[in-house]
Regions:
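Short hydrophobic/aromatic-enriched beta-strand-loop microsegments
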Residues: 4-11, 62-66, 85-92, 141-148
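A contiguous loop/helix-start segment that scaffolds small-molecule binding in enzyme catalytic cores
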Residues: 22, 32-38, 50, 93, ...
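Class I SAM-dependent methyltransferase SAM-binding "motif I" and its flanking Rossmann-like core
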Residues: 42-116, 158-161
């Protein structure tokens, strides 16, 4: 309603409206003041999203919590773009890896994933894209398929599909940036690109 108080606490790399500790405290203060707080989180609250920290902090202060579940962008965005993360005879598993660890470095799991036949989904990795590609170039062929999807499923979605050797140029050509997910693996080669679906949600295709 119009009487609802809305407080923006969003985060982008290097630009935080509030620190995580401040967000935790704000949840408690507002719950004690109003009796009811909705913490609306973008992205994936329980996949690199620190959602459990907020719940723990609230419950430590005697505030009951409830979770409204959603679909992870790591699964939903590839699916909406016709990309299966597993496929018989092609990929038996998939990895979901953060592009930015708590010490702001690329996860060491990327090197392990690059040596696997699994599909790899990297979240928050655009600012380390060249480092990721360099690791893969040490372990995989240049024709390894890669998809990068910015603002997945939204009307301003951008998507490029290329290979290990071409994806960097495509990203620059179409000016992709964060927030985006990086999908690496042979299942990308078999993507079913549903143009009708993309048009129905207002996506202008560029790939």
């Amino acid at each position: 309603t119009s009487a609802t108080e809305v407080i923006f606490v969003g985060k982008r790399l290097g630009c935080h409206a509030y620190t995580q500790d401040q967000i935790n405290e704000l949840i408690v203060v507002m719950a004690q003041k109003y009796g009811h707080v909705v913490r609306l989180k973008g992205g994936d609250p329980f996949v690199f999203g620190r959602g459990i920290e907020e719940i723990d902090y609230a419950e430590q202060h005697g505030i009951a919590t409830a979770i409204v579940r959603g679909i992870s962008s790591a699964l939903g965005v590839p699916a909406a773009n016709g990309i299966s993360l597993t496929q018989r005879h092609i990929a038996e598993s998939f990895w979901v890896i953060t592009g930015t660890t708590s010490n702001h470095e690329l996860s060491k799991d990327v090197t392990l994933a690059a040596q696997s036949a699994a599909t790899v989904v990297i979240l928050m990795g655009m600012h380390k894209l060249e480092q990721i590609l360099s690791i893969y170039q040490s372990h995989r062929d240049d024709d390894l398929p890669i998809a990068i999807i910015q603002n997945g499923t939204k009307s301003d979605q951008k998507r490029v599909i290329g290979t290990l050797s071409s994806i960097s140029q495509l990203v620059e050509q179409h000016q992709l940036s964060s927030p985006a997910i990086i999908i690496i693996g042979e299942t990308v080669r078999h993507a079913s690109l549903d143009q009708h679906y993309l048009e129905s949600i207002g996506v202008k295709e560029i790939s």
